[in-house]
């Protein structure tokens, strides 16, 4: 039996978090796979030591727009293939999608859109959700096991944010967004963190504006999901809430293969 440790983190700028000790943390944590969201850089804008980390293969999927969005993956064992989109141009150009084939499972590293900016962006977010669900269902229905990680930009239930009442009309906790997560789960996917932890006060994002983190006024926006058939392989799912450097903290998953 092999235990695989996967970490997911919205770093809110890879160059910024690098200046705050990212590589030291990475080398101490030693995940088998590290998925990053919101890297805000193309590979050529990154220092060499971020592009080439000893013992890892790295894959960068930047947005076409400079300094925006983008996802990355560092992995000890290279995937047999890596797909960077759903085949829908308006979603695939924003650097939000990596789908890596590790033979035993497909790993989706996704930075889901934020719907706060405008009605138009909320519509884009919901359409992105549906394109993702269609893609992951197709893979799962063909017999693949899947792990989905990343920043979903939505808190699912009242337990998943500190102030649900005040935020019921705010994107990130709108009924329509929460209903999509319900639908996702009904399609046969499991929120792995809630397999192990049913406590309130468990968050992964805190606003920079109001010293929210020291008061733990946060939201749980980052998730590891697996398909129902694969959940027996999940040994642990946790939040690394003491890791600083971004407005999000990392989350972890251990699976036994």
UniProtKB/Swiss-Prot annotation:
Q: Any note on cofactor binding?
A: Can also use Mn(2+), Co(2+) and Ni(2+).
Q: Which domain of life is it from?
A: Archaea
InterPro entries recorded: AP_endonuc_1, AP_endonuclease_F1_BS, Endo/exonu/phosph_ase_sf, Endo/exonuclease/phosphatase
Question: Where on this chain does Mg(2+) 2 bind?
Answer: 151, 153, 248
Active site (UniProt): 151
Q: What SUPFAM superfamilies does the entry give?
A: DNase I-like (SSF56219)
- Would the keyword Heme turn up in this protein's UniProt record? no
Task: Sum up the protein's function in the record's words.
Answer: Involved in DNA uracil repair. Recognizes DNA uracil residues within double-stranded DNA and initiates DNA-U repair by endonucleotic incision on the 5'-side of the 2'-d-uridine residue, irrespective of the nature of the opposing nucleotide. In addition, acts as an apurinic/apyrimidinic (AP) endonuclease hydrolyzing the DNA phosphodiester backbone immediately at the 5'-side of AP sites, and as a 3'-5' exonuclease. Strongly binds to double-stranded DNA.
Name of this chain's protein: DNA uridine endonuclease
């Amino acid at each position: 039996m092999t235990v695989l440790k996967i970490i997911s983190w919205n770093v809110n700028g890879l160059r910024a978090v690098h200046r705050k000790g990212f590589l030291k943390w990475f080398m101490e944590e030693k995940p088998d796979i590290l998925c990053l969201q919101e890297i805000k850089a193309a590979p050529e804008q990154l220092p060499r030591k971020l592009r080439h980390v000893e013992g890892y293969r790295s894959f960068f999927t930047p947005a076409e727009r400079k300094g925006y969005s983008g996802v990355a993956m560092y992995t000890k064992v290279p995937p047999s293939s890596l797909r960077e989109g759903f085949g829908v141009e308006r979603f695939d150009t924003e650097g939000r999608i990596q789908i890596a084939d590790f033979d035993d499972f497909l790993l989706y590293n996704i930075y889901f859109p934020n719907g706060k900016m405008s009605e138009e962006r909320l519509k884009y977010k919901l359409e992105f959700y549906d394109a993702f669900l269609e893609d992951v269902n197709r893979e799962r229905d063909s017999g693949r096991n899947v792990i989905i990680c990343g920043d979903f930009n939505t808190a699912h239930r009242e337990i998943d944010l500190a102030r649900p009442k005040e935020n019921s009309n705010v994107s990130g906790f709108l009924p329509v967004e929460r209903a999509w997560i319900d639908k996702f789960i009904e399609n046969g996917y499991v929120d792995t963190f809630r397999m192990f932890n049913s406590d309130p006060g468990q968050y992964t994002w805190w606003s920079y504006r109001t010293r929210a983190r020291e008061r733990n006024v946060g939201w749980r926006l980052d998730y590891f999901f697996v398909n129902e058939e694969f959940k027996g392989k999940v040994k642990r799912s946790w939040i690394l809430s003491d890791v600083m450097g971004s407005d999000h903290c990392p989350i972890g998953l251990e699976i036994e293969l």
